[in-house]
A protein has these predicted regions:
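A short, conserved acidic/glycine-rich loop-to-beta-strand motif
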Residues: 124-134
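Glycine-rich hexapeptide-repeat left-handed beta-helix
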Residues: 293-390, 394
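An N-terminal, well-structured beta->alpha segment
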Residues: 379-439, 443
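N-terminal nucleotide-binding beta1-loop-alpha1 segment
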Residues: 1-19, 380
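Catalytic-core segments of class I nucleotidyltransferases/pyrophosphorylases
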Residues: 100-102, 109, 115-122, 135-138, ...
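Short catalytic helix/loop segments, enriched in acidic residues and glycine
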Residues: 20-33, 400-408
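Conserved N-terminal catalytic core of the sugar/cofactor nucleotidyltransferase
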Residues: 2-5, 13, 27-116, 146, ...
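Extended, small-residue-rich solenoid/repeat segments and analogous flexible loops
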Residues: 188, 201-301, 305
Length: 443
C-alpha cells in the first residue's frame, strides 16, 4: 500500500505562523504536524509515500529528505500552480497506478486506525472509501449522506446552516482505486468532493463511507492549531511526544536545565536545551521549543512557543502562540489569543492586548501598548545607541553576528593605518563578542 500526503496548502488562516513556514511544518508538541502523519502511516505499515507540494516546497523537502530518517521512503511532486486536491494527486499517477492507495492530509492531526480503514476498503469492493466523522458544527467541512449500508449518496462542500443535511463530514482521508485517474487530465484543477466523487456517484460507482470515532482535527486556523497542541498534551490524541517523560505529564528533551526554584505544572513539553531560571513558572498546557530560555520569575500559562525564544524576567504570557526566534524582554505581558510571528522583539514593559497578531520581524518599543495587529511595516527603536552605548543581552540581542557587523560598520569609517583598542571582562561571552568585533574591524 502506498500513500499520498497532501502538503501543498499555503495555510493563509494560520498566518502569521505560516508567513515563513509551510503549514505541514507547523509544530504540534515540538514535532511538525506532517511528521505526526508520517509516524501514523509507518505505524500501520505504509512506508511508500508521495507528498504533493506547492507552498514553500523546498522547506518540506529539506526537512524530510528521502524519508529514510523517518523510517519511510518519501518522494515528491510539486504543483507550479494549485491544482486542487485531486489535480495534485494526478501528478503522482505514475507512482500510484499499481493498486489502491491512501490519501491523507499533511496538515491535519489524527490517530485514525488506518489498518481498519484499509481492510474495510478491501472487503467492500468500493472504488473509493472515505473516512467520515460526526461533528457538532459541520460548516467548515464537506458534508456527506450515507445509506444504511454506508454507501455515500450525496456531497456538499462547506454548507451554510440552511443547507446542512447531515452532521457527517469528510475528513479528507481516502482509499482510492487508480481507475479514478481516468476522470482527470494532467495539469487541470480538480477537487475530490466537488468534481470526482459526484461524477463517480453519477456513473454508479461505489463510494463507501468509513465512520470513525478516532481523533481527527483539521488545523485550519489559529484557534484549531492551539487546540491541537492542547489535545496532544492531554492525551486526547495518540501520538509520540519528543523527549522523555521526566515526571507524570512532563516531557523534556536532552540537555534541559531546570532550576530547582522553577515550577513546571503538567502537562508540559520542553524541547532540547530549554533553560528555566529560578522562580520561572511554566504552567499547564505549555509547549516550549528547543533552545528556549525562560528567565527569572517569568510566567507562561497555556503558551505554545516555538524554538529559540527568550522570555525575560517577570514576563507574563497566557493562552498565546509565539513563533521562533522571538525576544520577549522583562515585564512584558502578552494577552490571551495573541500570536507573535517569527523574529519579533518586544521591549521591556510592553503590553500586547488579547487577540493581537504580530507579523514576522516586528519590534515593539519598551512600554508600548499594542492594541491592534501589526502586519505592514517595521517599528524600530529610536536609536542603536543608548545612555551607555550599544547594550543588550549576550547571545540574545548582542549576538556574534551582530558584533561582527558592528565592527565592520565602525571600521568602514576609519582611515588606513588607524589604531583601535578593544577590551573586555573575563566572561566567556565577552571574549567571543570582543573577537567578533575585532574580526569585523579587520574585514
Amino acid at each position: 500500500m502506498k500513500a499520498v500526503v497532501m502538503a501543498g496548502g499555503e495555510g493563509s488562516r494560520l498566518r502569521p505562523l505560516t508567513s515563513r513556514r509551510p503549514k505541514p511544518l507547523a509544530p504540534v508538541v515540538n514535532k511538525p504536524v506532517m511528521e505526526h502523519i508520517v509516524d501514523l502511516l509507518r505505524l500501520h505499515g505504509v512506508t511508500e509515500i508521495v507528498a504533493t507540494l506547492h507552498y514553500l516546497a523546498d522547506e518540506i523537502e529539506s526537512y524530510f529528505g528521502d524519508g529514510s530518517n523517518f523510517g519511510v521512503h518519501l518522494s515528491y511532486v510539486v504543483e507550479d500552480t494549485p491544482l486542487g486536491t485531486a489535480g495534485a494527486v494526478k501528478l503522482a499517477e505514475e507512482m500510484l497506478s499499481d493498486g489502491p492507495f491512501l490519501v491523507i492530509s499533511g496538515d491535519a492531526l489524527t490517530d485514525l486506525d488506518l489498518t481498519a480503514l484499509l481492510a474495510d476498503h478491501a472487503s467492500s469492493g468500493a472504488a473509493a472509501t472515505i473516512a467520515l466523522q460526526r461533528v457538532s458544527n459541520p460548516l467548515e467541512f464537506g458534508v456527506v449522506i450515507t445509506d444504511d449500508r454506508r454507501r455515500i449518496t450525496r456531497f456538499l462542500e462547506k454548507p451554510s446552516w440552511g443547507e446542512i443535511f447531515s452532521d457527517t463530514i469528510n475528513t479528507g482521508i481516502y482509499v482510492l482505486d487508480p481507475s479514478l485517474f481516468a476522470y482527470m487530465e494532467r495539469g487541470k484543477n480538480y477537487d475530490f468532493s466537488r468534481d470526482l466523487f459526484p461524477r463517480m456517484l453519477h456513473e454508479g460507482k461505489l463510494v463507501q463511507g468509513f465512520i470513525t470515532e478516532d481523533y481527527w482535527t483539521d488545523i485550519g486556523n489559529l484557534q484549531q492549531y492551539q487546540q491541537a497542541n492542547y489535545d496532544a498534551l492531554s492525551g486526547r490524541v495518540r501520538l509520540t511526544i519528543p523527549g522523555s517523560e521526566i515526571s507524570p505529564g512532563i516531557w523534556a528533551g536532552e540537555d534541559c536545565h531546570i532550576d530547582p526554584a522553577a515550577q513546571v505544572l503538567a502537562p508540559v513539553v520542553l524541547g532540547k536545551n530549554v533553560t528555566l531560571e529560578a522562580g520561572a513558572v511554566v504552567g499547564a498546557d505549555t509547549v516550549l521549543g528547543n533552545a528556549t530560555i525562560v528567565a527569572k520569575n517569568a510566567k507562561l500559562h497555556r503558551t505554545i512557543a516555538w524554538q529559540d525564544g527568550y522570555f525575560g524576567e517577570f514576563s507574563s504570557l497566557s493562552e498565546c502562540t509565539v513563533a521562533d526566534r522571538n525576544i520577549i524582554k522583562d515585564h512584558v505581558t502578552v494577552g490571551e489569543g495573541s500570536v507573535i510571528g517569527s523574529g519579533c522583539t518586544l521591549g521591556s514593559n510592553a503590553i500586547v492586548r488579547p487577540n493581537i497578531k504580530l507579523w514576522p520581524d516586528k519590534t515593539v518599543s519598551s512600554g508600548a501598548i499594542v492594541s491592534m495587529s501589526l502586519i505592514y511595516g517595521i517599528k524600530w527603536p529610536g536609536s542603536l545607541f543608548g545612555g551607555v552605548g550599544v547594550s543588550g543581552l549576550a547571545n540574545v540581542e548582542i549576538t556574534p553576528e551582530f558584533a561582527l557587523k558592528l565592527g565592520q560598520a565602525f571600521g568602514s569609517h576609519l582611515k588606513p593605518g588607524q589604531t583601535v583598542m578593544t577590551s573586555r571582562d573575563a566572561h566567556p561571552a565577552a571574549r567571543v563578542m570582543n573577537r567578533c568585533v575585532i574580526s569585523g574591524l579587520l574585514s
